[in-house]
Amino acid sequence: MILSGQFQPPSHQLVVYGQPLAQALPRVIRDFWVGQSIIATNTSLAAENGLADKVSDILHETLRNTITGIRERSPREDVMRVAAALRGKGVDAVVSVGGGSVVEAVKAARICLTNNIRNAADLDRLKTTTTAASPRPYLVSVPTTLSGAEFTQFAGITDERTGVKDTFHHKDLAPDVVILDPAATLGTPERLWLSTGLRALDHAVETWCAKEPTPYSDATSLYAVRNLAHWLPITKVAPADLEARLGCQIGGWMAIQGATIGVPHGASHGIGRVLSAMTGMAHGITSCIMLPHVLRYNLPASHDRQAILAQAMGTSGEPLADFLAGMVNNLGLPSRLRDAGVRHDQISAIARAALADARVKANIRELDTEHAMTQLIEAAF
């Protein structure tokens, strides 16, 4: 079959990798002519002598404010707090310090400014349309996990009224600069680091096994799988190994590239999104549990592609799903829904909700009946 399609590169984003934060951040501040800056972070990273303090010392005279307490799943209320701070006169840049929840909140806060969103309910307007104006001020991301949210042009924000996580898009929503300093991740709790590493693998695997992958998404996802399969287990046994942590960061960067050009993920992401909304389960944990089961379900439709990934991960003829399940176990992460707080009586509702998810509908093998979905989730229970 002759390949056919079109390619538009992702956003014009500067990614600085392998350089210490104390070296990279001042150069960014200088190059962007930043006179006033703000830090946005979560409670743990804002602790005394934590990473936010180190960033504060680096920003020095430009720092005007630090917004703390951004919560998991990026609630609308937190988005509005950040937006209010960004409205301050003369703010040129915001530095997000933390994982996906922090950077998602800041990404959304920036489009609140360009769309004159003044309260949480007003965010509903952005579900259908946003101004073409590029988000401002500049956003510099210092990620501490492997979620990949710092590379995408969309933000998932939780509506506290419904518990639903809405997605907001803008072509320029991704941060202007991402600084991948492995030392900045040393304080990340082990379970969070490793589970977001599995999430990154899920990004890469489902991109590679998508219905309509592209040459770009194939190249980046295959690179990601090789990197993460090699380096992530090393960070379990040698958590201070900066080379291994940087290898994971680069793997996470490559893993999400398919999503940045519109290659849809599949049922692992779709079911995971529902699990997160209905049970509060972290996205990384949903990937640990669901990805092997989805791969087994998809095997008739993606056998050859799964075999290539298994080989790239260094398996000796072992099925990809089994290899990943073993990896989850070796990393000490949950592999069953019941071990992550899901009750058996929730399965039917989860199955029904998952059938409506766009990622499930994009799955490489049809998964469109309640019976099939329930069987799949039961297998993971």
Tell where the protein language model's regions lie, with residue ranges.
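A glycine/threonine-rich phosphate-anchoring loop and its flanking beta-alpha core
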Residues: 13, 114-213, 308
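Short Gly/Thr/Asp-enriched flexible loops that form oxyanion-binding sites at enzyme active sites
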Residues: 82-83, 102-116, 152-153
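Glycine/serine-rich anion-binding loops at beta->alpha junctions
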Residues: 91-107, 144-149, 278
